[in-house]
Amino acid sequence: MRPKTFPATTYSGNSRQRLQEIREGLKQPSKSSVQGLPAGPNSDTSLDAKVLGSKDATRQQQQMRATPKFGPYQKALREIRYSLLPFANESGTSAAAEVNRQMLQELVNAGCDQEMAGRALKQTGSRSIEAALEYISKMGYLDPRNEQIVRVIKQTSPGKGLMPTPVTRRPSFEGTGDSFASYHQLSGTPYEGPSFGADGPTALEEMPRPYVDYLFPGVGPHGPGHQHQHPPKGYGASVEAAGAHFPLQGAHYGRPHLLVPGEPLGYGVQRSPSFQSKTPPETGGYASLPTKGQGGPPGAGLAFPPPAAGLYVPHPHHKQAGPAAHQLHVLGSRSQVFASDSPPQSLLTPSRNSLNVDLYELGSTSVQQWPAATLARRDSLQKPGLEAPPRAHVAFRPDCPVPSRTNSFNSHQPRPGPPGKAEPSLPAPNTVTAVTAAHILHPVKSVRVLRPEPQTAVGPSHPAWVPAPAPAPAPAPAPAAEGLDAKEEHALALGGAGAFPLDVEYGGPDRRCPPPPYPKHLLLRSKSEQYDLDSLCAGMEQSLRAGPNEPEGGDKSRKSAKGDKGGKDKKQIQTSPVPVRKNSRDEEKRESRIKSYSPYAFKFFMEQHVENVIKTYQQKVNRRLQLEQEMAKAGLCEAEQEQMRKILYQKESNYNRLKRAKMDKSMFVKIKTLGIGAFGEVCLACKVDTHALYAMKTLRKKDVLNRNQVAHVKAERDILAEADNEWVVKLYYSFQDKDSLYFVMDYIPGGDMMSLLIRMEVFPEHLARFYIAELTLAIESVHKMGFIHRDIKPDNILIDLDGHIKLTDFGLCTGFRWTHNSKYYQKGSHVRQDSMEPSDLWDDVSNCRCGDRLKTLEQRARKQHQRCLAHSLVGTPNYIAPEVLLRKGYTQLCDWWSVGVILFEMLVGQPPFLAPTPTETQLKVINWENTLHIPAQVKLSPEARDLITKLCCSADHRLGRNGADDLKAHPFFSAIDFSSDIRKQPAPYVPTISHPMDTSNFDPVDEESPWNDASEGSTKAWDTLTSPNNKHPEHAFYEFTFRRFFDDNGYPFRCPKPSGAEASQAESSDLESSDLVDQTEGCQPVYV
């Protein structure tokens, strides 16, 4: 593929068509009119001027407007015919005989091809070298190997204005902004006579630029094996030194590369693989730049001659408003071609696309200073329409490597030189076309990135209160060595090459201060005392150099700044903001750090997690099976069944998403406290988003850990999560935070059985029969799930809106699972005592607060004291089976013992083993054979008396050994139909509820004292528990979080019944809605 270059003309055809057109025009010179043409040997000059002038006009017109396909070349051909008319009738033999051998030798020595030079002299009649050169330039298209050189010549045609005009000797063009003019009229004076040759080296300085290019042509494109023989030179070394040789290499056309001593072969700049040549760099890949006065013969063939004193100046981008687009000019020193003239401003404009680096001036010339636009801001000037100030160049270091230009077309092939010949320093054209690399999209590759070298950053602009200094005149030029020592060294990272310093002077109005914060002695004290920029920078540099050991002067200035109190109120230097971290963020970061847990904790967690995952999957399968069974019973059609399945799938998806949402107590608002227990409290709470009502039970972690209740809490969570029946309070959410555990459950507004016993004292036998029958079914459902409640008592039996019961508070429940065993939550060989076991705290009645209330009757006072013990921090052993207290091993029969004790209390009015202290109560329970007596004055039916004695007995003879059917078959329940759903039957007692948030059925609770006292008492135990020697188990509350699949927004009960006359009217509708709710409880997955 040909490289993308800039066409030298607007001609739309290809080069072959253009050559064919020129050949046809040259073969028919007689078609053009020849009248009025001057004859004579001196007519060539005028014709040439006319031709050149017309070419200039043609190129300018081509730039202004579009021309036909062959329009400009018709005019050019006509003018060529004018110049060839005097020789149209000459024969080739006669012309060949008249060839001037001296001119032929001079042209050959100048680098022209011998055949081309002979043909040119034949056609021009050996009149002058000027005419021969003109012919060679016109016939360059006929040589295909010089096609790209001709392309360069055409690009520098007069219409483009790319060639410099011959300049007069003046000191410098710097800052003038002049652009090179077009070609001037060619005069043959420099080529005639003895001034051309070794005796007249200055002729090249006054020679027009294009003809210097023609006299010193570069070698065209060659293959790897092609050898180009250079003709011998006929001029002296001084003329040779006047030009620089740029061999045009590569597969397309040549790219000059400058090499100086010390530069390694290959590319000195690290480039990405997409721009690197896959062929090895050739040894002679860079041209030699001979210097003036170089010793030795020209043909010495030095591989690395001393660098030329020249400037390698890139031109602006072709889109910029500049006359020279992508041209690279080699400007010699004062003794060489154009040496006396500095390049104009347009030449010194840097180019971004050519990716060139600047060479540096050599010789005895003075070091120029950097302009105001520094390197850091150089790219900001590379925009179309912007005139960049001239870039002065830094003194060149001969011992430092110079990076070459980066280009994707630098694929150099090794080209051996002529055998037996030393490589001469051949001149080359002064203009070279810069190739713009095409944008190639490469796949992303992992490229090793070199570590960047630290460089000095440019500080921010000085504060507004510091007056900008007036632009000072440029300082006197200093030698390169002094500049290197006086200025800061900037290390430029070059691949494999050592870093070399650059002399950079940040002068002019754009000088910048060091970055803030500034030292205290530089702070502004008052408006009258203004620091100029130089003093600020000097003071900052001094403070930075001083480091921790500051000089005495700095201490004095600091003391004076501190002592000046008036200056504190003045405006200070704005320093960089210092980030301030909040304590809360620090805590979050500390909490978010990954903690290291023991392998035992990991094992504990994984075993529970795997069990819960399997359980969750099984529940999902059961829900699908339940849906299919319900749809089969309902006889739904296939479309309806598919719709119900989609509804279930959507619910499953929502459930999985909601399970991942983190919950905290801020999602609930506490309304009122319902009760206080041993480890926490139960309160009525409202969910913020749905305004649903829940009963939220809060347990303090420190009390749970201190009382060794972790296993019990886990058991309660498991039973509430797995229980999905009407006899157990439904758990909706369970979550935890740093201090507490939370259970969010159904709110049962009817209160508990203990409150009803305190109010009614003694139940009628039919009411007791109803509650005991429902309690039997509730315990049976717990046993069927594989759990043992172990704490059945009136406080844990709740009465719902319709008067039916529900079990709650499974804190002492166990399912004979390993997670419900306390030993898995303890460390060491010391085992803590279970809370159900006898304790010295049972004799502590300091927590009893019944004495604070007025005692109207002795019996009522005893009842209230009993309630106080039930809600105390240690509980009461009144309802616990003796085998549990004796630690002899127990089964689910211990729950049936509790049923007999509750039946006794309902019918008699007090527990059978009531005692002043828990210890005495425990002793009575253990010696139940001697202490259990049914009062004679209490009139009980024989069935009730028999049931009590068969339940409160030894475990071997207790009812319930064969399950709940033993109790259902007892004569005491002859009036109860267990075959039908007892919850659908109307209850003998229905609590009075006025509104959904009515808590009148619960005992009033002092919301502060018991809780605060408990927290104060347990703080010491918590401190002891969390000490380094007795650290609490880290795996205590794994897998505690829970979310129920079907959330009915906290309204498991119907709307409260109206009071008074409206009750009878709404009773039938209430019963129907009750039946609907009860029917859907078993198949809730079906309904959304």
Swiss-Prot record:
Binding site for ATP: 674-682, 697
GO molecular function terms listed in the Swiss-Prot or TrEMBL record: ATP binding; metal ion binding; protein serine kinase activity; protein serine/threonine kinase activity
Taxonomic path: Eukaryota, Metazoa, Chordata, Craniata, Vertebrata
Residues the record lists as Phosphothreonine modifications: 279, 1041
Organ and tissue specificity: Expressed at high levels in heart and skeletal muscle and at lower levels in all other tissues examined.
Effect of residue 697 to A: Loss of kinase activity, autophosphorylation and tumor suppressor activity
Protein's UniProt name: Serine/threonine-protein kinase LATS2
Organism, scientific name: Homo sapiens
Annotated ranges, domain AGC-kinase C-terminal: 974-1052
Start and end residues of each Protein kinase domain: 668-973
Job of this protein: Negative regulator of YAP1 in the Hippo signaling pathway that plays a pivotal role in organ size control and tumor suppression by restricting proliferation and promoting apoptosis. The core of this pathway is composed of a kinase cascade wherein STK3/MST2 and STK4/MST1, in complex with its regulatory protein SAV1, phosphorylates and activates LATS1/2 in complex with its regulatory protein MOB1, which in turn phosphorylates and inactivates YAP1 oncoprotein and WWTR1/TAZ.
